[in-house]
């Protein structure tokens, strides 16, 4: 897990039954290195790769993701981040909510959560 996961007492992702819940994920590496500091598109790519790795580590795959929530620090980033999301989930089309928030901690421009359901049958 990341530095902040241990400090704050949470998991990147948890699996309960068939559900995988991925915590709000930002483009941070280590304790404080923001990846693609001024690039919302680059942050979205980094975040979605991190989310897919977390889902995979718990036995899921991209096609198991049924919901995403995208938080943007600036609504002007909606199109560029949405296009990245669209490339990652083309043809899968999970439920999605995208909202602008008043602020994200640090220099983050994007934060994304995800939920997956793994058919264990």
Model-predicted regions and their roles:
Residues 1-121:
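Short, polar/acidic, helix-capping and beta-turn segments at strand->helix junctions
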């Amino acid at each position: 897990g990341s530095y902040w996961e241990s400090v704050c007492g949470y998991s990147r992702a948890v699996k309960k039954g068939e559900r995988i819940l991925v915590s709000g994920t930002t483009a941070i590496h280590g304790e404080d290195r923001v990846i693609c500091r001024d690039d919302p598109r680059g942050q979205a790519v980094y975040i979605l790769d991190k989310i897919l790795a977390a889902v995979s580590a718990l036995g899921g795959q991209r096609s198991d993701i049924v919901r995403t929530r995208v938080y943007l620090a600036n609504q002007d980033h909606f199109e560029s981040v949405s296009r990245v999301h669209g490339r990652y989930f083309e043809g899968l089309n999970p439920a999605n909510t995208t909202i602008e928030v008043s602020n994200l901690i640090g220099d983050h421009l994007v934060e994304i959560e995800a939920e997956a359901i793994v058919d264990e049958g």
